[in-house]
Amino acid sequence: MKHKGIVLKLTKSKAIISTNDFQCYYIKRSPTIYVGKEVEFTNKDIVTKKSVLIKPALSVACFILLIACVLSLSKIINNISPKVFAYISVDINPSFEIEIDDMGNVLNLLPLNDDAKVIADKLEIDKINVSNAIDIIINEAIKSNVINENEKDFILVSSTLNIKKEENSQQYQSEKEKLDIIINSLKDSIEKSGKADVYIVQADVNEREAARSKGISTGRYVLYNKYKDLENDLSLEDAKDADVNVLIKSMLDVASEERNPEESPKMTPTPTPTHTATHTPTDAPTPKPANTPTSTPAAKPSPKTASNSASTSTPAPKPTSTPTPTLMPTPTPTPTPADKIAYGQFMKFESSNYRGYYIRVKSFSGRIDPYVNPVEDSMFKIVPGLADPSCISFESKTYPGYYLKHENFRVILKKYEDTDLFREDATFRVVPGWADENMISFQSYNYPYRYIRHRDFELYIENIKTDLDRKDATFIGIKVD
C-alpha cells in the first residue's frame, strides 16, 4: 500500500512523516529526504507506525510540528516571492492589469472585465517580459477582431509605480526612472511591430486606488480626467464603456480643435496658475551643463544674421541616422536669434541641424516641424522655472497654464499640476549649445544628465553621447512678438 506525506522531522536514521489523515510514521531516512519534502512510501518502508488514535500525545505533537513547518515554509515562500514593482494597465477593449517586478517581468495578469477574462484563459504569460506579454495580448485581440491591424488602432497603457509619491525621495526618483525605461522599451516594441499605436499615461497609487473603487481601469480613469481638463462632457460610465480607440482619437481631435481658434471660436484658454507672477523681463542665468561631455564638440560657425536685411540661410547638415526630410522649406527672414533668454517674453526655438524646423506642440506632444499651423503652437512664454527660478519653464501661448514637461522621457504639453514632481519635470536649465556655444541647449532639472533633443522629429530628454546627439540637442532661440 502506498502512502503520501510531509517530512516533519529527521533523526539520525529515521524520518517522521505526517499523512493527510493525521497519521504519523517513522520511515528509514534516505539522503534525498529533507524537512518539508512531500514523499511517497510503502508499508515496507515503515519502521514504526504510530496512529493518532493510539497515541494522542504523539498526534498532537505531530500536528504542532506540522503547523510549525507550514508557517516556516510560508515565510520562506513570502521572502522568495518578488515584490510588485509597478502596475501596468492595458486597455484594448478587454482591459487587463499586469503586475511586474523591477526587471519588467510579469508576476500576475488580472483581467478587469468579462471580455478580458475570455482572452486571459487562453494566455500563458507568466515569467516573461511585459513587452512580450502585451504583444501576446495584442495578437490574441487581433485574432478576436478586437484590433484592426490594417488601421493600427490605439491601445491605452498606464503605468503606476507601487510606491507612495514622495517626489523628494531618492528611492522614488530612482524607481520612477527605472519604470520610465521599461515603459519606453514597451512602447518602442509595440510600435516597431506595426500592430497598433500606443497612448501612454502615468498614474500614482492614489489614482489607481480611485480607479479601482469606481470599477474602471487606471488608464481609462486618467483619460477621463484628461477629457475633463479639455472641458469636454464625458461621464465616468462613458469612459468605462467606450471603445478605447474611439475614446483616444476623440480626445486628440478635441484637443486639436481647441488648439486652433479659427476652427473652435468658443475655446476659452485655461487661466495661468496663480503661483506664476508676472515678471519684468530680465536675463535668465545661463549655467554650464552639470555633466560636461568628455570630448569638446567640434566648433561650428554660428548662424549669420542681419539686423537690417533678410537673414542668410545656413545649409542643413545631413544627420547620420535621423531621417532626412524629403521637403526642405525655403528659408524666409526670421527674427534675430536671441543672445540671451529673458523672462516674460515669447520665443520660438529652431533646430540647429534642421533649419526651418521649430519646436512645437502637436496633439500635446513635443516635436519639431516646418510650416507650423497655427504658428502659435511653436511659441512659448519663458517664465521662471517652476521648481527653480534660476531656470526656465515653457508656457504654451496656445494654452496658457499648460507647460512643456517630460514624461517617460518624452516631451509633452500638460496642464499645470500643483505637485513638486510636475514642477521639476517642467523645469529646464539654459546652457550653451552642445554643438555650438553661440546657440542654446536645455538641461532637465531633475535628470541633469539628460537634455531636450529631437529624434525622428519627436522631442525627448536623453543623454548626449554622439556628434549627432549634440546637433539634435542644440537650438536657436528667436524672440517673437
Curated annotation (Swiss-Prot):
Compositionally biased spans, kind Low complexity: 266-283, 291-315
Residues in the Extracellular compartment per record: 72-481
UniProt topological domain (Cytoplasmic) ranges: 1-50
A Pfam family the protein falls into: RsgI_M
PROSITE patterns attached to this UniProt entry: RSGI_N
Keyword list, A-Z: Cell membrane, Membrane, Transmembrane, Transmembrane helix
Gene3D superfamilies: 2.80.10.50
CDD domains tied to this protein: beta-trefoil_ABD_ABFB
Chain spans, region Disordered: 255-339
Extent of Pro residues compositional bias: 316-336
Subunit structure: Interacts (via RsgI N-terminal anti-sigma domain) with SigI5.
Chain's role: Anti-sigma factor for SigI5. Negatively regulates SigI5 activity through direct interaction. Binding of the polysaccharide substrate to the extracellular C-terminal sensing domain of RsgI5 may induce a conformational change in its N-terminal cytoplasmic region, leading to the release and activation of SigI5.
The protein, known as: Anti-sigma-I factor RsgI5
Organism for this UniProt entry: Acetivibrio thermocellus (strain ATCC 27405 / DSM 1237 / JCM 9322 / NBRC 103400 / NCIMB 10682 / NRRL B-4536 / VPI 7372) (Clostridium thermocellum)
Gene field: rsgI5
